[in-house]
């Protein structure tokens, strides 16, 4: 089984789906001849041509609007938002149009589209190239919100998203594009949208994470294992719809829960996980649910020392696990 990094898995998923279904096309800034700023679409322009790999103006509202219109006419657009920080001009199109079209038409119209959005900090991008805006969209019924944490899941989830009859926002942890590697089958497969994945079984503390933070959570779990702390790591993978069953099963086993994400603490996705636990497994808890998240400041600093202060890392996760384990 070949090994590849996360961005290679994303590219392979799009390539395979474009070869499988001629309705699939890509639209976004620099996705054509340049192959994308992260090289996620490299080679696809030469293979499929300018009518299926379309360079757009710097206008996210138009990128998503074109995708919605094409989807309504039976196409399967994959819209790339160059950085998730740039998704806000398209917010109305996503929330008011794409997410609500099936509901308002009583199921007559569907919007089978994917919006790919590299997210997260840690690459020296500063305020406007480091944001994690996933919580805005998990508050929007009608959307599915997916965050892969491994090359295997990146390929399988993206293929599932492209085949889905409804709009999917596909957040990709850009710091992990080339850092996270793993085996990926060459044959056609999908990873179903919805179920979380227990990637490390344990009995003392449950850690819930996604994207780059899941990668770090596994490292932190190995670090504290040497101290006798047995950590269960749950990769949430799909943020909306929420896999509440897997979350509750894990907490009922360990009695302690840590939720990790790099987005700001207040109003972040971790609050939804914490509420799920409070409502469904309160009597199973041996300690308060702990959230380890980015601080409530307007953006990720450009200064590298300040960026390191902002970002969650394996050492910070390990420290939070130790604190919970002492209860």
Residue ranges and their predicted role:
Residues 1-167, 171, 174-327:
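Thiamine diphosphate
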């Amino acid at each position: 089984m070949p090994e590849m990094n996360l961005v290679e898995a994303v590219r392979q998923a799009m390539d395979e789906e474009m070869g499988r279904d001629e309705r699939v096309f890509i639209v976004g800034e620099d996705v054509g001849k340049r192959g994308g700023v992260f090289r996620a679409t490299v080679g696809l322009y030469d293979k499929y041509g300018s009518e299926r790999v379309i360079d757009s103006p710097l206008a996210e509202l138009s990128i998503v609007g074109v995708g919605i219109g094409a989807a309504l006419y039976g196409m399967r657009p994959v819209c790339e938002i160059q950085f998730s920080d740039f998704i806000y001009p398209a917010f109305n199109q996503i929330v008011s149009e794409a997410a609500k079209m099936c509901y308002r038409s009583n199921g007559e119209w569907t919007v089978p589209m994917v919006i790919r959005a590299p997210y997260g900090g840690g690459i020296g991008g500063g305020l406007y190239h480091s944001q994690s805006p996933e919580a805005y969209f998990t508050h929007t019924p009608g959307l599915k919100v997916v965050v892969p944490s491994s090359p295997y899941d990146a390929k399988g989830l993206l293929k599932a998203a492209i085949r889905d009859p409804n709009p999917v926002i596909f957040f990709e942890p850009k710091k992990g594009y080339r850092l996270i590697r793993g085996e990926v089958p060459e044959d056609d497969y999908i990873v179903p949208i919805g179920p979380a994945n227990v990637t490390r079984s344990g009995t003392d503390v449950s850690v819930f994470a996604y994207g780059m933070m899941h990668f770090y959570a596994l490292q932190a779990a190995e670090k504290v294992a040497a101290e006798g702390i047995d950590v269960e790591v749950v990769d949430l993978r799909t943020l909306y719809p929420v896999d509440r069953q897997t979350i509750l099963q894990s907490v009922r086993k360990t009695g302690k829960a840590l939720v990790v994400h790099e987005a700001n603490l207040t109003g972040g996705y971790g609050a939804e996980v914490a509420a799920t636990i409070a409502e469904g497994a309160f009597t199973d808890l041996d300690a308060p649910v702990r959230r380890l998240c980015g601080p409530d400041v307007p953006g990720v600093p450009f200064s590298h020392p300040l960026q390191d202060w902002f970002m969650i890392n394996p050492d910070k996760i390990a420290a939070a696990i130790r604190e919970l384990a002492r209860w």
